[in-house]
Amino acid sequence: GTQVQLRKSRIGFTRIQSVFISHLHGDHCFGLMGLISTFGMLGRTSPLHVYAPGELGPMLKAQMEMFCQGLEYEVVFHAVDTTKCQVVYEDKSLTVSSIPLDHRIACCGYLFREKPTLPHIKRDMIDFYHIPICYINNIKNGADWTTEEGDVIPNARLTTPAEKARAYAYCSDTAPFPELSTWV
């Protein structure tokens, strides 16, 4: 299913850096080995990070030893504690947190949050006030500009607001419970 959907969506397999698995029921994890194998056949060389309940670790290791010898890339397993909210992945633009879910077995959802970006510079104002490039980052970070004549140009005149950061919560296979709405 996963590989078919990726192909239908025209998402390049090489763009996938991480896989997040909520729990160890077959419809959520059986496709992982096929995906790993396909990545290998396509010549992947960059690491693939797998975030999942800790119980997957030994099974993944055994299956990798059995079916995926000779891969040209590393599969890095990250055990996720399904009992608490915690940051499991972070880079310069994204944070992924686990969300405990109420299911028959250990299960968590994932909250994907973009980090806020800086405001956009109004190029026409930069040109108009002859602001040197070396000051652009200060302005993006909220600084006003003082002209050679001593006039202070407010930051709001030099920038436009950044787009609002987006978030997506993946919460499947759970019974409703009150705390869930406060986490997402």
Regions found by a protein language model. Name each.
Residues 81-184:
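Metal-dependent phosphodiesterase/nuclease catalytic metal-binding core
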Residues 6, 32, 60-63, 180:
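Hydrophobic packing residues within well-ordered alpha-helices of enzyme cores
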Residues 2-51, 79:
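Active-site metal-binding motif and surrounding structural segment of the metallo-beta-lactamase
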Residues 10, 40, 67, 86-88, ...:
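Short secondary-structure boundary/capping segments
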Residues 8-9, 38, 63-66, 183:
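A generic secondary-structure signal
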Residues 44-81:
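Active-site neighborhood of divalent metal-dependent phosphoester bond hydrolases
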Residues 1, 24, 55, 125, ...:
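Active-site metal-binding loops of divalent metal-dependent hydrolases
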Residues 11-14, 73, 92-94:
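Structured loop/turn residues at beta-strand edges in well-structured enzyme cores
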